[in-house]
Amino acid sequence: MKIMSIAVSKKKGTPKHPISEVRLIENHGIHGDAHAGPWHRQVSFLAAESIERARARGLNVTFGDFAENIATRGMDWTHVAPGARVRLGDTALVEITQIGKECLKKCAIYYRAGDCIMPREGVFGRVLKGGTIHTGDGIEFAGKSRGSGSISGGKQEMTA
């Protein structure tokens, strides 16, 4: 299982631009990304396989177009739950906090891509341990935290 793409943007609701490496900051997120900060969606994940399925349906999309920070290959995000932990590269650790999200309006991503799969297939987390990660680094599940997941408002979030 590996990281296929890392992407960042300066503004929320827009496609992200791929870069080769990035620094994850504990309790903050990805250095230089619009979604960084003291909240539960500091980092977003999407399976590369999901992007490939969107392409097969005729969408003209590539890594970063759905505003995902990290596209992965071989990670089965369909069975992950809030509280799961994910190790990225040699040192970084992210706790999954939310599965999917609500989109209240169609953003630039929807209009550019013709669909947005992040509300259905995106996975979000917060950085527990920082570190520098690179495209091509390994990624793996690393256990579960003590929190429990619940479903609220059409999305699954952490509860304390």
Protein language model regions, located:
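Metal-cofactor-dependent catalytic cores
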Residues: 1-160
